[in-house]
């Protein structure tokens, strides 16, 4: 993948296998960690150096000796919750302030009921300002991690599937 990305001028992102949504076969043993990725890439391409930057992006960026830049999203072994500024809005108007959230805020109903733009802005700002979501960090502390959401719950609430919220 990295060779292909380099050929087409794309900056590739690798992501650790996450225990979210329908990852019903997730286990820590199946996770290729950021460190594992860096080791494998270093052996294949030479020394890998970190690209130091102040950003809220979920990927940490790295450079190969030939100048190729790539990123790793290490949300399983080194979560980025402290700097996360992401949220997700589903196609049917549910707003989630964390990828790991099991509850969201219904924005469709108030919008369809005629909520003013100012009131909607206040609602969103109020919810965001009280945000305490740290889903990946909280999961990091669990020694016996199973999938975040059991398959039976996914059938009852499709919003819990990552593909419905862009995860």
What name fits each language-model region?
Residues 45-100:
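C-terminal accessory regions of radical SAM enzymes
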Residues 19-21, 77, 102:
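Residue-level detector of flexible, active-site-proximal loop/helix-junction positions
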Residues 1-69, 109:
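Radical SAM enzyme [4Fe-4S]-AdoMet core and its adjacent flexible, acidic
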Residues 79-167:
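Radical SAM enzyme core and accessory elements
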